[in-house]
Amino acid sequence: MCSICVDSFMFENGERYCHVVNKDTGEPLYYPNLYITTQVRNRSESISTMKVIAGSISLLYRFFMRKNINIDERIQKKLFLAPHEIEDLIEFTSLNFRDGGDGNFRILNVKKPTKYFRITTVANYLEWLCKILLSHAGQENTIKEVMAFINNIKRKRPRNNDKYNMEIEKSLNKAQLDSLFSILSPGGNLNPFKEKVQKRNNLIFLLLHCFGLRAGELLNLRIGDIDFAESTIAIRRRANDKTDSRVYQPLVKTCERKLIADTKLIYEVSDYILNDRRKIKNSNKHDFLFITYKEGKTQGQPLSFSSYHKIVSIVRQSSSHLSGLTGHKLRHTWNYEFSKAIDKNQEISDEKEQQIRSYLMGWRPGSDTSIIYNRRHIFELSKKTALEQQEQLFKGGFDE
């Protein structure tokens, strides 16, 4: 079991922070944390970004520990990683460590974007470290040697890192949605959850489906964000919120916005708050919408990311139709259904559609993010158009 890990904590002013530590000694690693502070935190990056960068750097030092490499000493002597060591490092960045330490990683590798990010972060960190440790040796040859070393690492990044080259089937089809809400129906025989949490969990998926919310947006919702008279729900940004007890604070990455809610949905929210949430111990100490029900010291506290993912995992295992379920797939589903609804309304121009979609999803005006979420609909339209074109061809309907 490797002892290098990322530890997260919260300052008194509410700022979330993380650092790379040696679990055996409890000591933070000097250079990795200097890098995180000066190159990441001071650029005002979010805690989420800090954590993934720190995770990649901790992975690098786990590799060094495994290979018995003193990287500071090697750099000072200008004995950079040899080609075979770089190959070993690249292979190490491919491994999935989600299930434990060095001895417990999954055989399956991480996906290309994750590997690409890890290698890029490792290369950027090592370039910075070389400049720090060799600052006294500012000769042109030294700089060339360092950049050759860094470029040898960057060349190993996987190709085809196009963010638009994604699987078409990201959204759920009608059969999957029917299965999902049949399972989640409070009091239903198929419901895998205890009765006391069934309303809460059903509402979680209703909000994900109705608004295409991100997990951070969902877990960041407060009762005060809901206007029951106007039937609206506000999405608010609250980075480093001192009143949020969660160290891993759910963040809203998108723009703030106000969403209109159907009266039936507002009723479900109101019913949950008045007849369900209020019965839980400590629930009156804050107004975060979703809370922990499990008895113990965390009862009544805001629902954590880990609890949210556990809920999704239990639902995923409840039906073979939902084997690939993630909360984010409902965001793709919302976009697919939005595109179909727009197609039925011929009065809405493409420009207006883009504006409406961007607002409801919280994207900045002019963002090309919609291309990612709209791939399934575009694929179906292109398929329909191609088939109609071929049908005309076989009917002899094209002019010479």
PLM region spans:
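Short, charged phosphate-coordinating catalytic segments
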Residues: 131-135, 208-232
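Catalytic-site neighborhood detector that most strongly recognizes the C-terminal catalytic loop/helix
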Residues: 361-390
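Basic, Lys/Arg- and aromatic-enriched nucleic-acid-binding interface segment
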Residues: 182-215
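Active-site/catalytic core of tyrosine-dependent DNA strand-transfer enzymes
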Residues: 262-323
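Flexible interdomain linker/hinge and immediately adjacent N-terminus
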Residues: 138-184, 296-298
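Conserved tyrosine-mediated DNA breakage-rejoining catalytic core shared by Y-recombinases
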Residues: 220-267
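Non-catalytic DNA-binding core/recognition domains of DNA-processing enzymes
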Residues: 42-136
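Short, basic (Lys/Arg/His-rich) helix/loop patches that form interaction surfaces
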Residues: 190-191, 309-359, 363-367
